[in-house]
Amino acid sequence: MPKAEGRIFDFKGHDAIRTDFLEAIDFDGKDEYIKIETDEFSAVCPFSGLPDIGRVIIEYYPDGGKIVELKSLKYYFVSFRNVGIYQEEATKRIYEDLKNLLKTDRIRVTVIYNIRGGIKTTTQMGSLEGKKSGEVE
C-alpha cells in the first residue's frame, strides 16, 4: 500500500469495530420509514492516519421486525474512532452490519464526509426498494 509523506499516526485494525455492541428491538411496523442521522462519526484514514469525520444517515424499513437500539448504535459508531478504514469500506461495513442485524433488504446508508484537501466525498450503500424480483443473493 502507498504511504503518506510526513507524520503518520497509529490506528487499530478492523477487528476493533464492535459489532457486538449493536442491539435490535422487536418492532411491529414493517411499513414505517425510519431515518437516523448523526454528525459524530469518525474513523481514521489508513493512508495518513488522519481522522475522517462525517455525517451518517441510515434509512430503513423494519421488514425483519427489528429496529436498532440507538444507544447501542452510538457505542458501535464510537468503536470506529481509532480504526484505520477507508471511507468506502466504512460505509459498506456499517451497511452490512445493520442489514444483518435488522434482517431487512430495504436499508440505505449514506456517509457525507467533511471536506479534506478540498475534496468532498459522499458514499452510499443499499436501497429502500428492497430486492428486485429474480435478484440473486
Curated annotation (Swiss-Prot):
Subcellular localization(s) per the UniProt record: Cytoplasm
Reactions this protein catalyses: 7-aminomethyl-7-carbaguanine + 2 NADP(+) = 7-cyano-7-deazaguanine + 2 NADPH + 3 H(+)
GO biological process assignments: queuosine biosynthetic process; tRNA modification
Enzyme class, spelled out: oxidoreductase
Amino acids binding substrate: V68, E69, L70, Q87, E88
Pfam families (UniProt xref): QueF (PF14489)
Cell division is among the record's keywords: no
Pathway(s) served: tRNA modification; tRNA-queuosine biosynthesis
EC number from the UniProt entry: 1.7.1.13
Xref: InterPro entries: GTP-CH-I_C/QueF (IPR043133), NADPH_dep_7-cyano-7-deazaG_red (IPR050084), QueF (IPR029500), QueF_type1 (IPR016856)
Keywords from the UniProt entry: Cytoplasm, NADP, Oxidoreductase, Queuosine biosynthesis
Gene3D superfamilies, alphabetized: 3.30.1130.10
Record-linked SUPFAM superfamilies: Tetrahydrobiopterin biosynthesis enzymes-like
Entry function: Catalyzes the NADPH-dependent reduction of 7-cyano-7-deazaguanine (preQ0) to 7-aminomethyl-7-deazaguanine (preQ1).
Name of the protein in its database record: NADPH-dependent 7-cyano-7-deazaguanine reductase
Protein's organism: Thermotoga maritima (strain ATCC 43589 / DSM 3109 / JCM 10099 / NBRC 100826 / MSB8)
Highest classification ranks of the organism: Bacteria, Thermotogati, Thermotogota, Thermotogae, Thermotogales
This protein's encoding gene: queF
